[in-house]
Amino acid sequence: MYQEYPPCQLLAPYIDKYWEFKGETEYDMRYKILPDGCTDFIFSIEEPSQPLNGEMLMQPYRFYFVGPMRVYSELVTRSIRLHMMGVRFSPCGLAAFARMPLGEFTDTRVNASELNVLFDDHFAEMLCEKESLQERIHIIDRHLIARLPGLQPVDPQIIRATDLIVQANGMLPIQQLTDKLYIGQRHFERKFKHITGYTPKEFSRITKFRYATRVLRQMKGEDMQQLAIDCGYYDPSHFIKEFRKLSGSPPSAFMALPIPEDDPLTYIE
C-alpha cells in the first residue's frame, strides 16, 4: 500500500523522497503518522480522507501542505479506498524554493492552494489525472528542476546544523552544536526555526525518536534499560514517556502493531 521513491540527483539536496499511499482500506480506519522533521505537499488522487481532529476533509484532485509536526497525527479514511501522493521536503529543502516562515506552520495542515507556493490547483488537477506514479514524479521533477536556477541559497550553518543533529541521532547537546558552528545560541535558534519550522531542541527530539523507532523495530527481547540509554534517554521511564507523547502509543504497543517494513513512520492502529 505504501511505497517510497528517491528524488532525482538534481533534487536530492532538497527532496527527501516521493511517496505513494494506495490501496483498499476500511471506512473510518485510522492511520497514525509519526513526526519526521520534514514537510510535505500531499496530492489527494482519489477518495477523501480526514485528519482525526476534523480540521479539513482532503478532497480528490486537491493538494495540501503539512507543516513541521512535533508529535504524531492521525488520518481517518472516509471511503473504502485511499490514494494519495506526497512530496516530502528535507528539513531545509523547502526553504530554498519558498521564502515562507515555516515556524508559523508548525503542527498545521492547510489547503495548499491558499499558500500560492510552488504548485497551484491547475497543477494538482493535471497531476492527479495522470495514469501512473512514474508520470506524476516526472512532472514534479520537471516542475521543480525548472526552478533551480532561481533558488536562493539556504543558510549553510542551518544545513550543517541539521546534518550534525542527524549524524548524532539527535543526541548532540545544543551548546556543543553552536560551539561547532561558531554562532550565538539565541540567533541560531531564531534562524533554525524560521528555516525548518522547529527549534533545534525540537528537531533533535524528533531525530532521537526516529532513531529509537529504528532500534525498537530490531529488538528481540533486549533490555529496555540498555535500549533507553543507547537512544539517549535517562532511563526506561523517560523513554516510554517520550515515546508515548510522540507516537501516541507505548513502545510495547508499537512493537506489536503491523508496521510495514519500508515505512516505520506510518502505521495502523
Role assignments for model-derived ranges:
Residues 1-169, 173-175, 180-185, 199, ...:
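Alpha-helical bundle regulatory/interaction domains
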Residues 163, 210-214, 241:
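Contiguous, well-ordered alpha-helical segments that form the cores/surfaces of helical PPI scaffolds
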